[in-house]
Design a protein with these regions (language model features):
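Short glycine-rich His-centered loop
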Residues: 1-18
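Active-site-proximal helix/loop segments of hydrolytic enzymes
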Residues: 23-248
Length: 248
């Protein structure tokens, strides 16, 4: 399940050029949906929620928990605390920006009932983003972030924990949140609004999803090693049946 962060009424952060985060989230999520379905994940569902911030969180968790989803992936774009914003003028309007930070980040909650599986996909996604030449956002371990400061779980790839985030904590399936990049950074905003960057990010998600599903469908060593019934001879290695591919 692909969750489009925020709503048309509660649009999230505002970009350096005065565009709502919700629009960035929707366009990227739609591209990821296309990429996943083209890769064979036909059951991919796009979740677009209406309402204000708090009620939409409750709604999206309720919808996710009512469906047989194997994974919940929330799509967002990043900003900075208000104290780090600077002023500039764009097209005759006084706006805010911060070029101090850039990059993606991947988030999980250690309070999710499927935390280990959530972390497994988060690691795959972060590695896939890094493999595309993207850098992760390092600032979330810094005191300057105030109450946005969070512990990092993987310093190599940019996986963080946000234990109390509702959509990560209360979903009953593995849940991960992707901050695809910073839209308050003037240069990165332009990149995030390009088809090229949306293709790069959606490709990383699809690559991570394939590895995630392949690992889950592989036979467990303890199951493969079980002793066959006594009245049936054990199959020779070259005769053993291959596991069927799992429908995505």
């Amino acid at each position: 399940m692909l969750d489009v962060g925020h709503t048309s009424k509660s649009e999230g952060a505002t970009s350096a050029r005065d565009r709502p985060e919700f629009a960035f989230n929707l366009h990227l999520a739609q591209r990821i949906e296309e990429k996943l379905k083209a890769a064979g994940f036909a059951g991919t569902k796009l979740l677009v929620t209406e309402g204000n911030a708090r009620s939409s969180l409750v709604k999206r968790v309720a919808v996710a928990n009512s469906l047989p989803a194997d994974l919940f992936l929330a799509i967002h774009h990043d900003s900075v605390p208000n104290k780090l914003l600077e002023d500039w003028e764009f097209e005759g309007k006084k706006l805010h920006f911060s070029d101090r930070f850039s990059g993606y980040s991947v988030w999980v909650s250690r309070n999710n009932p499927e935390f280990k599986t959530s972390l497994s996909f988060a690691e795959l996604l972060a590695k896939a983003m890094k493999a595309q030449g993207l850098e992760y956002a390092h600032q979330y371990t810094q005191a300057i972030m105030g109450h946005y400061q969070h512990p990092i779980l993987n310093k190599e790839t940019g996986v963080y924990s946000y234990d109390q985030l509702v959509v990560l904590r209360k979903t009953r399936m593995p849940a991960v949140l992707l901050e695809a990049g910073s839209i308050i950074n003037r240069d990165e905003e332009l990149k995030m609004d390009s088809d090229e960057r949306r293709d790069i990010v959606s490709g990383a998600v699809a690559a991570a999803m394939k590895k995630f599903c392949d690992a889950r469908s592989a036979p467990r060593p303890d199951v493969a090693a079980t002793t066959p019934p006594q009245d049936q001879p054990a199959a020779k290695p070259e005769q053993a049946a291959k596991p069927e591919a799992v429908s995505r």
